[in-house]
């Protein structure tokens, strides 16, 4: 009897693992990029809901995908912040953050929806999002307004991985980088989100090797690392290792004892730290 129960248990465990592995391989893009969650593809709030003047742009990538972007110019600014979003929601979720950078810090702001997010065309993938980033940097570097200003990257979670891709590939165009709760790689996050799949991480084709890209960033670019120590998705040691790996001679890390993955941004002192960084490095 005990043997039969054990066989049933083992059979169920094998079946569960097989299903989980198949899900990881075939549906990982929907897991990594939940652009559909909470109706984020159906409605996108706009900056005019807070009285922020903006220009809506359509950028076309190398593979002919149309991206929605918002250009918020501040004529008195000396810097532009490029906001790089996490993997859920849409750019409408960032209006309050736009407001802080634009009104409180006096910066120009540029933000765009990745392919497959918000009102942008296409389906998200690592390869595709990197083409999106190439397109945006090409636009900013040739734009008559933004090309005259310093460029600061602000990336949260997946947005941080995107920021590191940009900072490593376009190191001469990036003047500062702010990272929040960013991972070493997707493969190194899987064991913490899906423990049963820790032996199958090589099946993950969405890699985002932030750890590997960090070494290609400029040693002269200022970096600010913001880490929530109660992050339940990205283990805090990922941020600590990114900080330690960062070649910049001008880097700082701040850790928030009560910050989880999504609420580090509202922890006491978060925006004061960012303001001080921007002032100290001459961005505002």
From Swiss-Prot:
Which GO cellular component term is one of those annotated?
Answer: fungal-type vacuole
Q: What is its main location?
A: mitochondrion
> How is the protein disposed in the membrane?
Multi-pass membrane protein
State the family it belongs to: To S.pombe bem46 and M.tuberculosis Rv2307c.
UniProt-listed Pfam families:
Hydrolase_4
Query: PANTHER family of this UniProt entry?
Result: ALPHA/BETA HYDROLASE DOMAIN-CONTAINING PROTEIN, PROTEIN ABHD13
Which species expresses this protein natively?
Saccharomyces cerevisiae (strain ATCC 204508 / S288c) (Baker's yeast)
Source domain of life is Eukaryota
- Where are the Cytoplasmic topological domains? 1-8, 102-284
Membrane-side (Extracellular) residue stretches: 26-80
- Transmembrane segment boundaries: 9-25, 81-101
Q: Where in the cell is it found?
A: Mitochondrion membrane
Q: State what protein this is by name.
A: Uncharacterized membrane protein YNL320W
GO MF term (any one):
palmitoyl-(protein) hydrolase activity
Keyword vocabulary terms for this entry: Membrane, Mitochondrion, Transmembrane, Transmembrane helix
* Leftover remarks: Present with 259 molecules/cell in log phase SD medium.
